[in-house]
From Swiss-Prot:
Source organism per UniProt: Geobacter sulfurreducens (strain ATCC 51573 / DSM 12127 / PCA)
Entry annotated with the keyword Transferase: yes
Alphabetically ordered keywords of this record: Nucleotidyltransferase, RNA-binding, rRNA processing, Transferase, tRNA processing, tRNA-binding
GO biological process per UniProt: rRNA catabolic process; rRNA processing; tRNA processing
Protein name: Ribonuclease PH
Length: 238
């Protein structure tokens, strides 16, 4: 039994609340247990300079944590004058994951900017951000269709992400902070609804892991992502 009472193959309580903000074209509050992330999707009628005149659009992301999202206050990165390496890595991952399932040609020469702001962190903020940002992105696309700006949703398939790890010799799904801090191995999987991988991140903190252990983690991640996508679909149909 895990610290929060789950079995090894259980996700935390997952909740995705759509239309959380008034002004954004797409917005959700995504909750993975005690991890809470506000994801917004904003439409801009322009593209980066390297895409001008090419007929395609762009999807990009920014990620940040509120100063008191964690146990002790962390200074705002804006106050430091630069983004940290972890922030750069995570926001690039979110952007890549969403572009992997978007037909940028159908979007036309416009951009969707995703903002993922961590309100409360208890492990898995990047996986929660990707899972929630997908729903916010679809809502922004649906808004564009409703305005007659684009003819069809430029979404090829769904995308979601989850963490897995080895803690005390046991493979666990969707690690919380306590589990993540004790993990011998920590992995993040980003997958599409067709069962393809967008990204796999894995690190051995102590003992290196075997192919068999990696297969076990992959299998558990695939089960978790299938459940997450069912939740995404259910929420989008409401």
């Amino acid at each position: 039994m895990r610290s929060d009472g789950r079995n090894p193959a259980s996700l935390r309580n997952i909740r995705i609340t759509r239309k959380y903000l008034k002004h954004a074209e797409g917005s959700v509050l995504v909750e993975f247990g005690d991890t809470k992330v506000l994801c917004t999707a904003s439409v801009e009628e322009s593209v980066p300079p390297f895409l001008r005149g090419k007929g395609g659009g762009w999807v990009t992301a920014e990620y940040s944590m509120l100063p008191r999202a964690t146990h002790t206050r962390s200074p705002r990165e804006a106050a430091k004058g630069k983004l940290g390496g972890r922030t750069h890595e995570i926001q690039r991952l979110i952007g890549r994951s969403l572009r992997a399932v978007t037909d940028l040609t159908l979007l036309g020469e416009r951009s969707v900017l995703i903002d993922c702001d961590v309100l409360q962190a208890d492990g898995g903020t990047r996986t929660a951000s990707i899972t929630g940002a997908y729903v916010a992105l679809v809502d922004a696309f649906q808004w564009l269709v409703s305005q007659g700006t684009i003819a069809t949703l430029p979404v090829r398939e769904a995308v979601a992400a989850v963490s897995v790890g080895i803690v005390g010799g046991e493979v666990l799904l969707d690690l919380n902070y306590i589990e993540d801090s004790r993990a011998d191995v920590d992995m993040n999987f980003v997958m599409t609804s067709s069962g393809r991988f967008v990204e796999v991140q894995g690190t051995a903190e102590a003992e290196p892991f075997t192919c068999a252990q990696m297969d076990d983690m992959r299998s558990l991640a695939m089960i978790g992502i299938e459940r997450l996508m069912a939740i995404q679909q259910e929420v989008l149909e409401q």
